[in-house]
């Protein structure tokens, strides 16, 4: 899935040795499946790991990836380029801009997850939020969960009805209803 060169792995090991114990690596894509897709690497503390993350084992460290972007990371490579000036990580993900939401071979769940990542989450991320598809019930109800700044936000009702639900029902006629399964707790993380 993600080929990390030996030089890059050694670089990560060196960087992680200076971080708090338990800190690992996260690979992410902002706006996956769009022409504006951007790949990145960041530290990932134990508190940053979410239920929908996939844990990849490397030599002396782990990489966490949101399950919904796995298809965009096909044949991706992370390398460390060293020259006279210094060093730089390179991240090549040839499928990061591939739009999988139109792929009819994908399951409905995968298509909705990709749709959320491409069309809804870029807007929500401006407020530090994100929406995830938990599952599709037998009666074609999409069960979703908001995280980050959306959790506990006073505008969540509007976001749910006017953005998320309208768009899902419009683009996926097989979905009959959208239900928010988030246990909304207002706190410092909430946007409003």
Curated annotation (Swiss-Prot):
Residues where [4Fe-4S] cluster binds: 150, 153
Disulfide bonds: none
Domain of life: Bacteria
InterPro entries referenced in this protein's UniProt entry, alphabetically: Fe/S_biogenesis_protein_NfuA (IPR017726), FeS_biogenesis (IPR000361), FSCA_dom_sf (IPR034904), HesB-like_dom_sf (IPR035903), NIF_FeS_clus_asmbl_NifU_C (IPR001075)
Cofactor note: Binds 1 [4Fe-4S] cluster per subunit. The cluster is presumably bound at the interface of two monomers.
Function, in words: Involved in iron-sulfur cluster biogenesis. Binds a 4Fe-4S cluster, can transfer this cluster to apoproteins, and thereby intervenes in the maturation of Fe/S proteins. Could also act as a scaffold/chaperone for damaged Fe/S proteins.
Oligomeric and partner information: Homodimer.
Protein known as: Fe/S biogenesis protein NfuA
Protein's organism: Buchnera aphidicola subsp. Schizaphis graminum (strain Sg)
Lineage: Bacteria, Pseudomonadati, Pseudomonadota, Gammaproteobacteria, Enterobacterales
Gene: nfuA
């Amino acid at each position: 899935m993600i080929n990390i060169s030996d030089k890059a792995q050694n670089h990560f090991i060196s960087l992680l040795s200076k971080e708090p114990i338990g800190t690992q690596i996260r690979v992410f894509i902002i706006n996956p499946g769009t022409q504006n897709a951007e790949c990145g690497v960041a530290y990932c503390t134990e508190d940053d790991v979410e239920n929908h993350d996939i844990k990849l084992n490397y030599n002396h460290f782990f990489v966490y990836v949101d399950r919904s972007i796995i298809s965009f990371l096909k044949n991706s490579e992370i390398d460390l380029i060293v020259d006279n000036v210094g060093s730089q990580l390179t991240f090549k993900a040839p499928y990061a801009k591939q739009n999988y939401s139109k792929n009819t071979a994908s399951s409905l769940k995968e298509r909705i997850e990709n749709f959320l990542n491409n069309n809804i989450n870029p807007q929500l991320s401006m407020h530090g939020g994100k929406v995830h598809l938990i599952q599709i019930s037998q009666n074609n109800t999409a069960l979703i969960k908001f995280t980050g700044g959306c959790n506990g936000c006073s505008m969540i009702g509007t976001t749910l009805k006017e953005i998320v639900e309208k768009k899902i029902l419009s683009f996926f006629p097989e979905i009959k209803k959208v239900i928010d399964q988030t246990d909304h707790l207002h706190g410092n993380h909430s946007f409003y």
